[in-house]
Regions:
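A short beta-loop-alpha structural element at the N-terminal edge
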Residues: 2-14
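Hydrophobic pocket/interface hotspot
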Residues: 14, 18, 112
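A conserved beta-strand-loop-helix scaffold within acyl/acetyltransferase catalytic domains
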Residues: 29-42, 47-48, 54-65, 69-73
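Conserved active-site alpha-helix within GNAT-family acetyltransferase domains
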Residues: 100, 106-133
Length: 173
């Protein structure tokens, strides 16, 4: 299995896989243009024969925080290590950039506990994530995802004040 940074020609495969899980709410729907614009965030896994198996993205909020996003593998690749290899590559990339806090929102926290992630009870502790994505998410008022972080929770925010994130999260209820 090969894990590598995505190339622009991978965008249609990433788009198809990510959006195949958007209908049931597992992942948020992403536009093809958005995938293309952010393709450098993605890492992909391929079989030894070059078959696309899965992807994951690492989004940078600043030198203090990044987020693992859209980590997904094809059904036939589940339990074969592709997701683990992608996640390990994303963690390594964050470490190469000197980022000590990695966050994510998920419905499968047990997978991420094995990699040093822990739950964050109050999502407003991650104001950059709230301001970048959550306030425009269609599930804002009924979010069922678990916030998790690996490393310390950042004490700085570049996108919005912590107090406003706290209000936004608590208004969502």
């Amino acid at each position: 299995m090969l894990v590598r940074k995505a190339l622009l020609q991978d965008a249609s495969k990433v788009y198809d896989l990510v959006n195949s899980l958007s209908g049931d709410g597992t992942l948020l729907k992403r536009a093809f243009a958005e995938i293309c614009e952010n393709i450098r965030d993605f890492t992909v896994a391929e079989s030894d024969g070059g078959v696309f198996l899965g992807c994951g993205a690492l989004h940078f909020y600043g030198p203090h925080l990044c987020e693992v996003r859209s980590i997904v593998v094809k059904p036939e690749a589940k339990s074969k290590g592709a997701g683990s290899r992608i996640l390990a590559a994303l963690i390594e990339e964050a470490e190469e950039h000197g980022i000590q806090s990695i966050c994510l929102f998920t419905r499968i926290p047990d997978f991420f506990f094995r990699y040093g992630f822990r739950t964050v009870e109050d999502k407003s502790e991650l104001p950059d994530k709230i301001f970048k994505d959550c306030q425009s998410c269609p599930r804002l008022h009924r979010c069922d995802e678990v916030a998790m972080v690996r490393g310390r929770i950042p004490r700085v925010s570049l996108l919005g004040p912590r107090e406003e994130a706290h209000q936004l999260v608590h208004l969502a209820g």
